């Protein structure tokens, strides 16, 4: 009798599990069936302006009656340049770079890539030219190799190693007995925060993008590793136009151009030296991270 009761309980649990599974499956299917509100353009980028990004009085307002998240942003990033973006929490740094691959569309002004408004470009081709490394490093269950190949499926062994070297991640592979075939747990649970970030950056570099967006993606790296990473990206034969979003002045001080954001507006732009002399917000950020007497423009 007790055995029958046990089996009935198992059967009841199975029914509950199946009911939940069907409900989850329906929700997933509704996501797959959802139509994007964005439309893809048909124009193609100008090949002579490879990687050039321009904002013309661009801004975005979330929702119909929402507050402006970004307003009046104008700057030009030429091919191969590095643009640093710095500001406090909620200042609009991530929102700004998310306009480039059209994760959001500007509600005012224009964002141009290679001389063409991103809304007029073929969306698939636009995103093929861009690699984004988000704030949270995302790794999947598998191996180091399988995670890197998400960047480009047909990447060769040499290309994988080259990307790892630039991302300062080769030592991770060399420290594993299985090398590139070493196990990676879901979410990179068996790796440190810095290791996860470096592997995620390597995956982006394998795409050989024209535009590279590092959205506070080196926050777990020490200053020396961060500096080597930036130098290695700049030394590539065809360096991408790189956007470095950071709250650390040390990570963006050597950028070709720096944007300082405060409450969704650009309150200063220029080189590190210029901003240190003329931009109060940048001065405050810099002096809060370094002693005042240390800003003798050491290169």
Predicted regions and their residues:
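Cytosolic ends of transmembrane helices, especially the final helix of ABC transmembrane type-1 domains
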Residues: 4-31
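Flexible, glycine-biased helix-capping/connector loops in cytosolic signal-transduction modules
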Residues: 6, 34-37, 178
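Conserved E/DxxT/N motif and adjacent residues on the DHp alpha2 helix
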Residues: 30, 37, 149
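ABC-type nucleotide-binding domain
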Residues: 40, 47-299
């Amino acid at each position: 009798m007790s055995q029958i009761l046990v089996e009935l309980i198992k059967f009841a649990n199975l029914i509950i599990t199946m009911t939940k599974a069907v409900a989850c499956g329906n929700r997933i299917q509704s996501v797959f069936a959802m139509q994007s509100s964005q439309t893809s353009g048909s124009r193609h980028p100008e090949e002579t302006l490879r990687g050039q990004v321009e904002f013309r009085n661009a801004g975005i307002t979330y929702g119909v009656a929402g507050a402006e998240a970004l307003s009046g942003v104008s700057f030009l990033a030429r091919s191969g340049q590095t643009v640093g973006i710095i500001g406090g929490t909620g200042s609009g740094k991530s929102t700004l770079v998310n306009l480039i691959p059209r994760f959001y569309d500007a509600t005012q002004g224009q964002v141009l890539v290679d001389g063409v408004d991103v809304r007029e470009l073929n969306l698939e081709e636009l995103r093929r030219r861009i690699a984004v490394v988000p704030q949270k490093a995302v790794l999947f269950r598998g191996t180091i190799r399988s995670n890197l190949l998400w960047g480009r499926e047909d990447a060769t062994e040499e290309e994988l190693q080259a990307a790892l070297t630039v991302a300062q991640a080769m030592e991770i592979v060399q420290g594993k007995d299985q090398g590139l075939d070493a196990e990676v747990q879901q979410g990179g649970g068996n790796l440190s925060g810095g290791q996860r970030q470096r592997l995620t950056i390597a995956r982006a570099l394998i795409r050989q993008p024209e535009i590279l967006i590092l959205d506070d993606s080196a926050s777990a790296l020490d200053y020396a590793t961060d500096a080597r990473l930036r130098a290695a990206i700049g030394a590539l034969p065809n360096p991408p136009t790189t956007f470095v979003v950071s709250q650390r002045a040390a990570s963006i001080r050597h950028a070709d151009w720096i944007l300082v954001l405060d409450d969704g507006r650009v309150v200063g732009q220029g080189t590190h030296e210029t901003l240190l002399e003329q931009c109060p917000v940048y001065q405050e950020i810099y002096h809060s991270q370094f002693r005042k007497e240390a800003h003798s423009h050491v290169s």
